[in-house]
Amino acid sequence: MKLEELGPINVIHGPNNVGKSNLLQAIQVFFALVGTRLGDWLPVGELSVDVSTRLKEMGFEPTEIFNLESPKPITLKTVIETDEDELLRAGLETEADTHQASIEIELRREVGNVLFSLKSFVLDDYFDVVSFKLRVKQQGAHPAIPTRDFLRQFLSFLTWNPLFQKQQIERFALIDVERLPSSELALKLYDAKESPELEQARRWEKFLDAMSAFSDILGDGMFIAIYDRHKNKANLSYQTSFARMPLHLLGSGVQQCVSLVGLLLMTNATIVSIEEPELNLRYSLQERLRDVFKQKLVGVLGGPSQIFLTSHSPAFESGPFFYQMERTPKGPVVTKRKVEQARLAVGFPQEVTPPGMNAANCYLSTDGIVRVPERIRQVLGLPNGGGVMFLERENRVEMLSDEQFAMILDEEPGDDGDEQS
């Protein structure tokens, strides 16, 4: 299942405090509430149901989801594409073609509570659920009218992932910026490894496959999930031919990648959003993570069908478009833009390609991030990146690896004419 007209990886750029996180939270609220019932039916049209308790369970203060200056109703609209095989696996069989649903929900504030209404629900542009009437589709066509039971189950299908039989897994998950690896994540990975459920076990396999992309940084080996029965605690380690290295002893960038990949898979959600995946990662590692998302995780068996990323880096672009969020007098607006504009959108300089077929792109960003080609990294002795020092010379600056700089200090112990910056 996926949101129509959006790619597998959708990047949202915009200035700080414009509301990118609120946008992800709005998508989260939509999927969590769309299956809400009123008695044995749905709160359609002018009917409504109080969802304050559900919002609190999700971590929201119900009345604070509205604009505090002008708490007008919130309207969320979407078009969702469904997969026929997934519908069948969920036990949703119908004579009608049900591959697309257009849905509009409304949340409004009333005396300290939040009321939910299903304002519009149309299946494949032929059946209006709110009025419970067929639309004119095409001459000679006589589509079947879906039953009320099917419609209730269909909305539950949008809220919960039916591939997991023994637990309720939400369709949408949000991974915020507080995501350092934890014993809880290690336990989820361990449980996935040992799970009798095929879908769960696949996610552990996808984790191993995704992290194998970082073997040039970690060395030959693989991650293992261990459960210590005496401490009643799970841990992740990286096992080589000579040792098992606990995750907390690995570099902070690797830990961040483990956390992002692990959380992305262990949410078990169909659609996942990640806030600022670039945090604590050098630019080349951001690009590596993007490739892992694109090639090994998103849209493949055992992974989510779509992800949304909010980012201040251009490293995660993987399609022809990105989404720019901007302030306007009428409030924040999101527009689709060509990927060529991404660097400008986040304040990075446009790449300038030196002449020559094999010339590499180099630049210094406005945030002070330096990108150099692989050939220069080899000269520095840092093929996988690392610490560098800058020396000010007359009308120029030299970049050295930490090791090269230490060698200069050993050779010239009395030289203090250069200023380190």
Q: What is the role of each PLM region?
A:
Residues M1-L180, I274, L279, K330, ...:
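P-loop NTPase switch/coupling surface
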Residues M1-L42, D228-P355:
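Switch/communication elements of ASCE P-loop NTPase nucleotide-binding domains
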Residues K2, E104, I226, N361, ...:
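Short, surface-exposed charged micro-motifs
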Residues G19, E199-F207, L285, G368:
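Short amphipathic alpha-helical segments
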Residues F31, L107, F207-L218, M222, ...:
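Hydrophobic, Leu/Ile/Phe/Ala-enriched alpha-helical segments that form helix-helix packing faces
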Residues E81, K119, F150-L249, V254, ...:
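Extended helical coiled-coil dimerization/tether regions that scaffold
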Residues E84-E86, H99, S241-R244, N395-R396:
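Short acidic/polar mixed-charge low-complexity motifs
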Residues V298-G299, P314-S421:
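RecA-like P-loop NTPase motor core
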